[in-house]
Amino acid sequence: MKKITATLLTLLLSTAFLPAQGLLPYQDTSLSPTRRANDLLRRLTLEEKVGLMMDQSQPVERLGIKPYQWWNEALHGVARNGVATMFPQAIGLAATFDDELVEQCFDIASTEARVKNRLAREKSNDNIRRYQGLTFWTPNVNIFRDPRWGRGQETYGEDPYLTSRMGVAVVKGLQGPDGNKTHACAKHYAVHSGPEWNRHVFNADNVAPRDLWETYLPAFKALVTEAHVKEVMCAYNRYENEPCCGSSRLLTQILRNEWGFDGLVTSDCWAINDFYTPGLHHTEPDTIHADAKAVWSGTDLECGGSYIALPEAVNLGLITEDRIDQSVFRLLKARFELGEMDPSTPYDTIPASVIACEAHKLVSLQAAREGIVLLKNAPSADGRKAPLLPLNPKQTIAVVGPNANDSVMLWGNYNGTPDRTVTILDGIHSYVKPGKLIYEQGSDCAFETSYSSLMAVGKHNGKPGWSATYFNTPDFSGPVAATAQYTTNLRLYTFGATAFAAGVNLENFSAQFATTVQFEKDQELEFTLQMLGTFGQLYVNGEMVKELKGRVGDKEPMYRLLCKAGKPYELELRFSTGSGQCACMFDMGHTTTFDDDALLRRIAKADVVVFVGGISPRLEGEEMPVSVEGFKGGDRTDIQLPRVQRELIAKIHKAGKRIVYVNCSGSAISLVPEAEHCDAMLQVFYPGQLGGQAVAETLFGDNNPSGRLPITIYKDTLQLPSFLDYRMKGRTYRYMEQKPQFCFGHGLSYTTFAYGDAHIEPATLLEDGTMSEERLVIPVTNTGLRAGDEVVQLYVQRPDDKEGPVKTLRAFRRINLLPGETKEVELPLDDDTFAWFDTHTGRMMSLSGRYNLLYGPSSADDVLKCIEVTRP
């Protein structure tokens, strides 16, 4: 009888929470994500739990758990997942000093992401691929402490406060009002900002406590405590001898215990491998110990496959299953919050037509406009001519430079795929009358020669370029699945479930690309192919001349062909792939050697030269195989403009031309000689798909520039401390004692502004019984002849703190003023405004004492006004 009673009790308990409709608690959408996660967790075996702890989360079919892909990217729009709206690169968004606009950009990104996720689930029966999930590993809120860092373009600049405000805006836009539209991720935690070439071995062990709390951690804290970010990514490097993904101090003591973070922590991709790999961190003897160390320290999810050894770590007593349960609970709770486990969500009603729609692209255009920084706009040296900008479209204008007609440069890195891109040359074309525009590339960004594509010179089926014929079989058989025409180099891939063309499979397909070329003079052609697939074959007049197989990343020509004058050549590329992801990057062209003297002759009639230079994401970025003068592994070794451009600009100046220099880069470039040779200068960063239109609007006066530098532009590399030194002394505007070329916060306008004397408005008792915050009220007047935006900036200085920052940004506000209009700008003065490092507690806190409130249009001392205050 006792046995029957016990059995009955067990049955009753097991069904106590079973809804009437027969669903198990974790399947009941009316229950909270916490309750559902706890219920599902108790039903999983250890092996099933571990299968959920890697970025390619495994299904548990007996419980209805679908596979899930945690890794997704949205640095400046949905990335790696087909066509989407592309915004300016993150550093360009920071230059807007407009956190409301940035939030709008990422609200758009999360809207498009929800649609893409729904379409992917419907098409794949819930078996989505990488880059189709709802968890986005952005924003990057590392501090851009050194302009040599190639990934600095992914950040929001060198200032902790600006980075915090932009990062909070990104998280709010991605996560939405309910916090679960998509999930954002604050990365890379912590003390991480290059170099790229040693990030798997580097140990940040020379960081002063005040640098940690005043510089490296504030943005992460803001995203956790204010924006309630759902994920945090731990970095590759070591901090104080421990890999960041194995640092209990960072992940448990600070992140969870002090800041109250209750989301999940993911590793950077394959970072756990660095724990046990000889020659890298090698802090653990093997995978098993590395896995246990990472999870014990607080890394819930691994991007990679090392965690597969966790069951053995449990068996050896290196970690408990209870500790693994804590991590798996967080993962399950996040998936329930997103509705990823449910048959439908409210976001499923968003129509597919919103993807890359015109309204979204207009926001991208506005972000590009607001992020353009006017560095210089001076009258001629003799004073006889007015400032060069805005340009007169009736003039004869020569457009020169390696970035003028480069669409890919505009995209930055970690980019999506726009439906169209407007290059800077395209934008200028739209303003200048026919016959008044001269275009010459003139130089490469960094190399002595340049590769010029000739994909458009041939014809096939009566159309220019290359004709493509696709088959949904790997052997070119069966009906034609799709056709297409290409006049630019092929950049085709299936990453993120992006088909080569509509109607073409993602796997097991083939393609034929064909054209016929004929030249008036002898012409050598170079063919390049980077591929991932079964094979790529090049045919000339029906004969196969070269075959590549598997994965090929070599950028050297696969084949050279000398075409005789007047003779037609039938060219064909055949590409085939089986299962798995694939890529086909193909180009046909020739290497160009530049002739500066010939260029000067061709632009002799130009009234003005617009030189579009700088560098590109092909030279700076994440752990890149780049080896050229001034660059190393994605980073830079010299911050000057590359020599080939510097010399050409000097020659154009010597020829007597007035020059507008447009600098495209994700980092600060020293422009000392260029400032002497050029009458006007713009910094446009990597301005996104419509960046060319925004630049042209600015050049011709339809957009009044209002961007501000989120970085310092140094005079030369000699002004920088060692790249490997993470101490802030001498770095950025906050600690720099020398005078830079252009200061943080700098940006000119086509109008002028005047700042009146500010006053402090004290806190008052409100009708609801609460106290208003104390405010600094600053009168600002547009003293010019046209409307424009001004970015009002407040810096705080603690004169009695000789070891702290010289000054540090604590508030800003973008305003629009009509000619003659005055507005009173109110900036909050709260505890955070006066938060300073306290040497006694080792933490940030509002300290008593003397402060200087410095307000004005930039961080330059000569434009700032001051109010002295004393805090009790």
For each feature predicted by the language model, list its residue ranges.
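Glycoside hydrolase catalytic-domain context in secreted enzymes
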Residues: A20-W836, M845-D861, T870
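Bacterial Sec-dependent N-terminal signal peptides
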Residues: M1-L23
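Short glycine/proline-enriched turn or capping motifs at secondary-structure junctions
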Residues: K3, A860-V863
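Flexible, membrane-facing loop/turn or short amphipathic-helix motifs
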Residues: T839-H840
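Short, structured beta-strand-loop surface elements
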Residues: C866
